[in-house]
Amino acid sequence: MRSVDNSELGRWRELDSIHVLRLLAEHVKEDLSFHPRSSHLTTRWHVHVAGHDWEFLCTGPKFWDVRMDCGGGGAVDLVMHIYGLNFKAAAKLLKDM
């Protein structure tokens, strides 16, 4: 795989985490009963991807895995988290989408 240029990395960094989840997941459902405590922009999502069920809090490009108590920001971080990939493999997956 050729290297990823900075403009592409920047675009992936800014992608809305919900958009990325919809591209990756077999099933995505927003929890409409969720009422955020801090940012009114935060939403909760139940997701099935890569054979696992996940529960994410999403605010723009940032995500928080409620069950694993960790998170990140940007499409590369999200792909790395869900699939357990390194940066290079996550970038390749995004590039191939």
Please annotate each region the language model reported.
Residues 1-97:
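N-terminal structured subdomain of primase-like DNA metabolism proteins
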